[in-house]
Every structure is written in structure tokens, then in C-alpha cells.
Amino acid sequence: MRPSRRAPDELRAVSLERGVVKYAEGSCLVKFGDTHVLVTATLEERLPPWLKGQGRGWVTAEYGMLPRATLERTRREASAGKQGGRTVEIQRLIGRSLRAAVDLEALGERQITIDCDVIQADGGTRTASITGAWVALADCVNWMKARNMLKAGVLRGNVAAISCGIYNGTPVLDLDYAEDSEADTDANFVMTGEGRIIEVQGTAEKVPFSDDEFLALMALAKKGVARLVDLQKMAVA
């Protein structure tokens, strides 16, 4: 039995609320159970120097956690003078994941910056961030379309992410903190709306896992991502 009493293939309660920040070109408040992330998408008419003159744009991401997003206060990274390795890893993952869904040439020579700020953390902050970031990105693209800033479609499709793990010997979907901290294995899957894989991160925390166990996790992830994509489509409709 999972601590949350969910079925092995059951997501937490998920909500995707679009347009929550009036100043941003795109925004989304995403909730996976008690994990809440505020995501904004900012359009910038500038590019990294190494991309200038190439006729294509860029999508990048930044990620951070509020000090009391966690059970005990976490020191702000700004006060330490540098970002932690985990933060850098997650924001690069978010950027890579979103670029897989974007036609950068159709975007033109401009940049969209995604900011993911974790308000409350209860496991799965990176997967919630990616899922909500796609909604904020789509919101931003629609903002651009409404102003005739785009000549062609920019988004190739949906991108969503979900965690899976082996908890008490059972493959389960969408781990919360209680499960993640005790799981034998945990993995994060980033996929397209068609179920194609963008990235997989998997670790045997306690016990190495077999091919069959990995395939069971991937099957769960595909089901979970399909549900998340349905919610994304409803959010941007």
C-alpha cells in the first residue's frame, strides 16, 4: 500500500492553471498533489551571442525553490553566491525538454526564457516544472500569434514529464516525497504527446533494477504522460 493510498498507476491530483501572472507573456501554476510550481514564459528580443545571425531562436530555463518550499528553510542560492549542482541540472533538463517541442527557426531570432519557481515541494518538482512549463510556453506562443509575430507554427507538439519508481517491490507512478525517499528505484521520464522519449533519468537508490522492471516503469510513465497531455490540452484550449 502506498502512503497516499493511491493505486500503483494513479497520479496525484494534477491541476494546470494558465495565465496566472499578468505581466508575463505566458504563465502556469502547476500542482502535482502538494508540489506546486509557478512557471512563467518571457519573450525576449535577444539571443545568446553564439546564436546571433543564424536565423533561429532559443528556449532556455531557470529553476529555483522558495526557502520554505521545503519542511525546513532552505538557504537562498543567491545568498550563497552560486547555484547548486542540482539546480543547474534541473534547469538544463527543462530547457532541453522544451526545445524538443519547438521549431527554433519558426520562432525567429528571439528567446523565450522559462522561469520555474517551486512554491511547495513534495516530490517531483522537475517533472511538474516541465509539464507546467509547456503550458506557459504554449501560452507565450499564443500571445505571439495574437500579435502576428509568427509566420509558421512553433510548437511541434506537447511535452510532459512524470516520475516512476519501485516502492516496496511494486512499480508505481508519480512519487511523492514519502515514496521517493524510500523507493528502491526512481526514474523521471520526459516524453512527447505521442509517447516518444525525450529523456530518461533513472537511479537504483537501494536495489539494482531489471530490464522487466524498467519496462514496467516506462509503461507506467507512458500512461501518466498521456493523462498529463490531456490536461495540458484542456489548459490551453
From Swiss-Prot:
Provenance organism: Nitrobacter winogradskyi (strain ATCC 25391 / DSM 10237 / CIP 104748 / NCIMB 11846 / Nb-255)
Gene3D superfamilies: GHMP Kinase, N-terminal domain
Keywords for this protein: Nucleotidyltransferase, RNA-binding, rRNA processing, Transferase, tRNA processing, tRNA-binding
Full protein name: Ribonuclease PH
GO molecular function: 3'-5'-RNA exonuclease activity; tRNA binding; tRNA nucleotidyltransferase activity
UniProt similarity note: Belongs to the RNase PH family.
SUPFAM superfamilies: Ribonuclease PH domain 2-like, Ribosomal protein S5 domain 2-like
Pfam families on file: RNase_PH, RNase_PH_C
